Amino acid sequence: MAVTDARYPIGQYEPQPYSEAQKEEWLADIQFLPNAIENAIHNLDESQLATPYRDGGWTVHQLVHHVADSHMQAFVRFKLGYLEDNPTIKPYNEGDWVTTSDVQNLPVNISITLLFALHARWYAFLKSLEGNDWDKTIFHPGHEKK
């Protein structure tokens, strides 16, 4: 697989059929991601946190805050999709979000703490879904698809 956009090293998301085993693996990813991020950055100093993770990319500091921001969006989108009939979600400009004062000034441990709480809620919510609940959709106007 040739990578044409370094922002997406594994490629852009394309929905595919999935097995129950794959779903359980994804649920485990959601459950344990905060631990993985915390462990990955635990021994980094401020200089390392201020280092871009790739040429032209965000710093590790920005990336940690971005994960918290994007996962809050994802959690809300899952809830909207569950509670409403194919709701249109609001896209957001991720590049603008990493320039806000909270991202610039707060330590990454704030977003790590947020991720632990958020992922506990998200995982519990997803584990409660049954059968056809997993077939519900949202509409993303930026991608113009469900």
Name every feature range the model reports, one short phrase each:
Residues 1-58, 72-146:
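Aromatic-glycine hotspot motif
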Residues 66:
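Histidine-centered divalent metal-coordination motifs
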